[in-house]
Amino acid sequence: WKGSRLLADGSFGTYYAEKFQTTELPETANTKYPERVKAIHEEYLAAGAQLIRTNTYASTQAAFENRDALKENILAGCEAAGQAAQQGMGKVYIAGSIGPEVMDQRTTQERIQEYADRGTWLQQGGVDLLVFETFSDVTEIIPAISVLKRQQNIPILVNLAVNQYGYTGAGLSAAKLLKELAQVEEIDGLGLNCGIGPGHMAALFHKLALPEDKIWAALPNAGYPYRLQSRMQFSDNRVYFAQKMGEIAGKGVEIIGGCCGTDPSYIKSLAEQRDIWKAERDLSVGKEKETVGNREEKKATPALHDFYRDAEGACKKKKLIAVELAPPMNADDEKIMEAAHYLQNHEVDVLTFPDSPSGRTRADAILMAEKVSKETEMCV
């Protein structure tokens, strides 16, 4: 797949809930309503998808009575996808979807074994590849991936879920996690999915130079949901979605698709977006940025860590200037970044970030400080 581009499907869960007006766990349909599962796969294939994911994202032990029921559910999900693929036009790839395990009383080793078991049953179900989706921490999946790769040498992808600042739900930097994962030989592909819309995901990919020895994937949400009559809804965002996915494709991303809020109409719009399929890798990306998998170590200057010292490490012989920047009240950080760069160029020594000034809801002060520090190299 490296060097080519594949169109993946969109969301199964949110589309299933909307299509059948139900709040039940979509994965239970694998055994209860297999014809529904097959029909949704067929809709995505008709829209132009070349890669479909099994309806097994939340097929975990916590959701089913016992291991036998879980195994039956996963194999049924594989069967539904396989039946749909047989009726597709051309080659169709089936990805076995694995979502995060529930954090409960089980030990770390037990959860690692659970990941390995789920992957094993997907392999037995005949999938072409495995995809670990929407992860915020990779500690437990790396050992499981090693086990699965030894069992069957099929491609394994890992997709992280991040916020608009590039951090996962566990408060970890996606750039650092991707760097760690890029060093794992058993992992064939990396990417981002869920959590954010196409605009923020495109902005994150603009800041990354992607190692060429890995497959890269991008599957953002349709946008950001709103609540209507006790249901989470997504606005129709297809035109903007396709436009931003065209930008992402130009960064060298091979697998393009969607997550929450997307449906077959979104995938059809991607299939018809010529910019996506004729996009060539933007070789200028990352020339002045750090490469995820091959980051050049930088020597930390004393001024970065000790704002009261000069470049030689001696205490500055001047009055120090500290400026407070309040985090934005929404996701738009353009003004605060402009202010930070302005202050950087006017001999300000350190920036401070208050936590919820005036008691108003704002962007997280720690994450905002981290972002400013990374982009300006100022002490915060």
Task: Give residue ranges: language-model regions.
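Domain-level signal for soluble alpha/beta catalytic cores
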Residues: 1-380
